[in-house]
From Swiss-Prot:
GO MF annotations, alphabetized: structural constituent of ribosome
GO biological process, one term: translation
Phylogenetic classification of the source organism: Bacteria, Thermotogati, Thermotogota, Thermotogae, Thermotogales
The name this protein goes by in its record: Large ribosomal subunit protein bL28
Keywords for the protein's UniProt record, in alphabetical order: Ribonucleoprotein, Ribosomal protein
Source organism of the structure: Thermosipho melanesiensis (strain DSM 12029 / CIP 104789 / BI429)
Amino acid sequence: MAKCQVCGKGPVTGKNVSHSNRRTNRWFKPNLQKVRVITDEGKIKRMWVCTDCLSAGKVKRYVSTKVEAQ
């Protein structure tokens, strides 16, 4: 299963609980995004990163800058 390549967050198990208190198994999956990241060596790499790491600034996201011809 998929994991965040920065913090290691992965899916965990839990229970769905209905109104009658009947329990069934379920998975809680992390919100992973495949983003281009600038590594410590300055290389651009695609990684699976959870949104918690993105919003906390634990990775530096690569943004391409295209120059338009006028």
